[in-house]
Amino acid sequence: MTWQSSLQLHFDCASNAAKTRLYHRAHTGALMVQRALYPEPDSTDSSQAGICHIYVLYPPAGIADDDRLTLEFDLHSNSHAVITTPGAGKWYGQRKSLRYSRPSDSSKFTNGTQSANSNTSNDCFNDVVSAEQHIDARLDDHAVLEWLPQESIYYDHSVSTANNRFYLAKTASLLTWDIAVFGRQAYQETFANGHYANRLEIWRESDLLVSECTAQQANTRWFTSPLGLNDQHVHGSFWAIPSTEVIAPELQNNPLKLGQYLDATITEIRNLIDTQSLPIHCTHNFQGINCRYLGADVRACFEAFYQIRELIRSKWYKLEPHRPRIWDT
């Protein structure tokens, strides 16, 4: 059975209130949410208790064949939403009847940055029958989105396409991570057959801040080369984009000044990495911070990202630590 599912979530924050409200939600198919949660503590910053937490539910528990999932997030000014998932995402192997419908020419799979002006879902991927997930998020001024899904597991014979696009107003801020697990090592199953395609774009108004596009056929050298995954099967990438308000208004268009602010955050992250022996590397591109994991332990990746997230939330947003309970169930 093929699932075509969509989910729209719109958030706002009244000017006289500190509580973010999920004021609109609409869904088709199996994608859904239950209700908005407000689990964060009261703090010296009274707005922390008003941060809205959402769990995205997908009852089929996995994506396969030519399923298509579309998620749209719209955050109005001053809203702050934490959106996550209750468990790992699973990209299942295709049915045998579909495995032979895709081209065998792996030369059509390329790595690199593509023009982000097109909204065509597969314009940097070859045409194959694939399961797809598309995420489109728009953040108004002073909005904060934390899109922090749990890991995605790519089964042998899975054919996947994921597109993640974030459009930020000048003073919006974003925290987002993606953790990919190739194969199921506990079952001695590797990602030996299939295709993996993943794109991330982060825009600030008309400026493209981040563009990553990976499209690889299983068993290519990208999975074994030191320039790729180096024979590891867990890869994580965490991007943190601050509001431009962190620097003086007259300097907001100067990337070097924002870079100096990010340098200070990077120094604190590296101190955390050293003291906690976290298996993470981090850097910045003068617009945002990127932390990466490459290894064999998905929980080590997740816990390291969590600790870095708490440091960033404290430094940038003056928030006390809070861990969504769903991450421990």
UniProtKB/Swiss-Prot annotation:
InterPro entries: UreD (IPR002669). One of its GO terms (molecular function) is nickel cation binding. GO terms for cellular component: cytoplasm. UreD, UreF and UreG form a complex that acts as a GTP-hydrolysis-dependent molecular chaperone, activating the urease apoprotein by helping to assemble the nickel containing metallocenter of UreC. The UreE protein probably delivers the nickel. The lineage of its organism: Bacteria, Pseudomonadati, Pseudomonadota, Gammaproteobacteria, Moraxellales. It is found in: Cytoplasm. Residues 100-120 are annotated as: Disordered. Required for maturation of urease via the functional incorporation of the urease nickel metallocenter. Keywords: Chaperone, Cytoplasm, Nickel insertion. This is Urease accessory protein UreD 2. Belongs to the UreD family. It holds the Pfam family UreD. PANTHER family: UREASE ACCESSORY PROTEIN D (PTHR33643:SF1). Residues 103-120 have a biased composition (Polar residues).
